[in-house]
Amino acid sequence: MKYLSIKSASDKIKSGLLKTGVILSFSLFSSLSTAAFEVVALGVDGGVSDGNLTSYLIRNDSQPLYLGLDAGSVLPGIARALEKGHFAAITDAMAAPLTRQGYIFRQSINSYFISHAHLDHVSGLIIGSPDDSKKTIYASADTIDVLRNYYFNWRVWPNFTDSGSGARLGTYRMQVVRPAQSLSLGLTRLTGEMYPLSHDKSPSSMLLISSNNEFFAYFGDTGPDDVEKSKNLDTVWRKLAEKVTQQQLKGMIIEVSYPNDVADNKLFGHMTPTWLLKELKKLEQYSGEGQPLKGLPVVISHIKPSFQQGQDVRKLILSELQQGNDMGIEFILMEQGDSQKFQ
């Protein structure tokens, strides 16, 4: 399958109408197109920078409510997105008596999916919990166990959940998700299926999000199958290949934490560009002949900042990905506060 931009598709349709002499308002075709996934990057780094840790929002852009995808840095990301002019539909009058940032945090984010319980994926959730509104937290049994017993336990932090030790303040309803279980995600009009990932000594997970029979894949931290001695990614690629062949996969977010000069025994459950390209080759293989992934948007997340003088690690990783990219994939680096549509 070739992933065709909306503009390219529009131009081809217009050209065809002119050639056949059919006169028809193009707005009709626009109205027939399906809604897009909107993704807002609240945090994109893989550690160190505590104000810019992994967290994204996603919604069907015809719906007002977002699903949070991890929650490393939430409020700083909302503030940055507002500075960049996003969330324009949420005005001061609409948000009152809250600030726009507060309204988005409390009202627009309807629920969260947490891929795993490492601090760089949950610290924003924990810190923000005293001022949050009631929400459902979707996660694996292991992740729920860590959140309940090691964070929200009245020793590290008050228990803002509906289970666990001590008084239960009940802000967050903890919902265990079983592998491959299909479930509705709060009031977002999104549905999802979770698949296990291998992240060194910690289990992680991928969420396959769907809306109107279109799909978007969000990966928590993961190492390559060969290094992790796992088949988890292979299972995921076979699942995603079904969506590629049906032209239903609109994009994905996946990690590359380190550049290629990091040895396999120093990855600790993460990816390099070479390893991600090898893994995506499996998806290509399972998806059919030709270049089935051509034009597929792949957002690279969780890049770990470097303290080395003169090294732009984000630029380096993108360059290494592009050098080995013979699949026609569109690799994307989102910055904190960016918003992008996938359709």
Curated annotation (Swiss-Prot):
Catalytic activity: a nucleoside 3',5'-cyclic phosphate + H2O = a nucleoside 5'-phosphate + H(+)
Biological processes, Gene Ontology terms: cAMP catabolic process; negative regulation of glucose mediated signaling pathway
Family annotation (Pfam families): PDEase_II (PF02112)
Gene3D superfamilies: Ribonuclease Z/Hydroxyacylglutathione hydrolase-like
PROSITE patterns: PDEASE_II
Matching InterPro entries: cAMP-PdiesteraseII_CS (IPR024225), Pdiesterase2 (IPR000396), RibonucZ/Hydroxyglut_hydro (IPR036866)
GO molecular function, one term: 3',5'-cyclic-AMP phosphodiesterase activity
Enzyme class: hydrolase
Protein name: Probable 3',5'-cyclic-nucleotide phosphodiesterase
Name of the gene: cpdP
